Amino acid sequence: TAWEGYEKIPSWIMEGYGTMASEAAEQLREAAINRPSHVFVQAGVGSLAGAVVGYFANLYPDNPPTFVVMEATNAACLYKGAVAADGEPRIVTGDMPTIMAGLCCGEPNTLGWDILRNHVTAFVACPDWVAARGMRILGAPEKGDPRVISGESGAVGAGLISTLMTDDSYAELRDLIGLDKTSNVLMFSTEGDTDPEHYRKVVWDGAYPAE
């Protein structure tokens, strides 16, 4: 992460993540999608999220996509900063149990936070079952869709989108971000089955069912 006085190396890391956003934009153009309506991106300290949001906010300055940032509930430092609504980052301390190990970070990158607080429409704190749902959906998609082997931190976007679109108890958030069946959503799977045994427990055995 970054903090005051330590920003150079974190900025290089964010530049690297920006390459991923650039490659995604190129793939969208090849698929004749001029602009995604929404960009869903997960966050730990916010380096990846800041790079992705910053890239697409600059790519579409006059009509940017709706940005949604997802965190693990027990490590949702960016969400807490957004709720505080004073522009200052917040730090989560103590135990942060979650299956989304890659998102288990309690101190935000100040460089990323500065981008995110100015461009993100919704910060969402996601419980583990949302990530597990995404893993199962991507691992066993509907006919015609490609299979994606995605780990816990990578699949949370698919789980959240599916939940928002199928569970009317989240209609307020769905309406807030303008998500509907006409949306073109860009999301990023940032890991595979880094723990194959746990992946099987979730995808095959149904661990962490929806609550």
Predicted regions, residues:
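Active-site-adjacent helical/loop segments in soluble small-molecule enzymes
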Residues: 3, 14, 107-177
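Glycine-rich phosphate/pyrophosphate-binding loop at beta-loop-alpha junctions
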Residues: 3-118, 173-211
